[in-house]
Amino acid sequence: VGASEVVVALGPWAHELLFELGYRIPLFVKRGYHAHFADGAMLTRPVLDTEQGYMLAPMKRGIRLSTGAEFASLSAPPTPVQLGKAESAARQLLALGPQVERMPWKGARPCTVDMKPVIGAAPLHKGLWFNFGHAHQGFTLGPVSGRLLAELMMGETPIVDPAPFAPGRF
């Protein structure tokens, strides 16, 4: 496949590819867990327990329990300790139904040392563009990051100052 322009938007896997191309972007992974429980108690609003480090969110078919984050490599096996403690604390607060999925969801959130995404032209390769490193805000920032990158690629005036996100800052 040939292309004059290529976007690297590989989340936590961007580091491995870009290292081979000579880039040393300090990207690390924070990992979090979610578990989905059938309706036990009725929950109409999200509940955040900052002391125990978890959040409960109502869903159409149950309740989603999510935890904070842990530092782990992409290949590290799951560590269910955090999720187990959060589930125990949540069950003291309200009656969670049985867990819907056999295995909880585990997500790797790509983070840079300054906690800002990497968006813009690659400094070493013409036609190579970056859009990754959004940490916990990947779904939230995805649309506006895509817009910013498209504006940069098209030579248009960007919606925001792209300098804080420039790949060359590392």
Spans of features found by a protein language model:
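C-terminal lid/capping helical subdomain adjacent to the catalytic/cofactor pocket in oxidative enzymes
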Residues: 118, 122-170
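Active-site lid/adjacent beta-loop-alpha segment flanking the redox-cofactor pocket in flavoenzymes
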Residues: 20-28, 37-127
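Predominant activation on well-ordered alpha-helical scaffold segments within soluble catalytic domains
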Residues: 15-18, 87, 147-150
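Flavin (primarily FAD) binding-site architecture
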Residues: 5-24
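Glycine-rich phosphate-binding loop signature in dinucleotide/nucleotide-binding domains
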Residues: 1-2
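A generic structural signal for short beta-strands and their flanking turns/coil linkers
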Residues: 31-33
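Short, glycine-/Ser/Thr-/acidic-enriched flexible segments
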Residues: 13, 70, 136
